[in-house]
């Protein structure tokens, strides 16, 4: 097909549905392929734009198709949905991807590298292990409370668990259960520490992450995740765009010429947003030891707004600073 200029692909686990268009938007081909057949088809096509939704497997396919000489564009599924016509099927989805791609104002997702995907997987596994560790601690608290034993909040139950059977009469099966939970807690701690060591080792060889560590309040985990999400930062036109992508800006609902700002939009990566807010709170807790324009700005905001509002505003500012540090290759300066 020498006239094809745009190919929309609806990705699947084993099957791929394509919709091919020429420069005027007329349909040239609709066909279903397997993974191998799709590669063979794209290898014989002239260089063109290949568009896909940024879903599972999209970043790998983007890298693979780019090696075949095509220009790959990834679109967030939420921007494709308005272009779906009538009933939904795989071919209509592929056509909707083509329609969305042809819009001049459409926002696209930059394909991730293999290293970025691997680091993102490490962060997701660590986050899951941390949640599992909290769950194990809460279970031990709850089981002891059912037998009238109230323990302090946090990991104190772990430190005092060995003395609990000696101080209180408990059924043998409960003691064995608590022992298993304690062992599981220790296993989770070991896994989390191992992943954090891998992140620190990778961080030592990443120049961008090292520059991000110069930002006050930013630690190892946050710097690693920021470096993974930002890449070279060129996917965002400005620091304002990156701040908005983290969901740390007010949600707008305006009509009739009246502008209404609501709570933060909470878009994007929830884990990154949570870490940035934690970094902001750490900075605010040690505000008396901070100096420079950022500290003066935070002090001024605290005189006018609640500390929770200031924490979100500071988290947004830290995200914008991270974009500048990444794109300009500089370090943070007070």
UniProtKB/Swiss-Prot annotation:
Keyword DNA-binding: yes
One family name in Pfam for this protein: Transposase_20
GO biological process: DNA transposition
Record's keyword terms, sorted: DNA recombination, DNA-binding, Transposable element, Transposition
InterPro entries linked to this entry: Transp_IS110-like_N (IPR002525), Transpos_IS110 (IPR047650), Transposase_20 (IPR003346)
Molecular-function GO term, any one: transposase activity
UniProt keyword annotation of Ligase present: no
Family, similarity comment: Belongs to the transposase IS1111A/IS1328/IS1533 family.
Function statement: Required for the transposition of the insertion element.
PANTHER family xref list: PUTATIVE TRANSPOSASE FOR IS117-RELATED, TRANSPOSASE FOR INSERTION SEQUENCE ELEMENT IS1111A
Protein name: Transposase for insertion sequence element IS1328
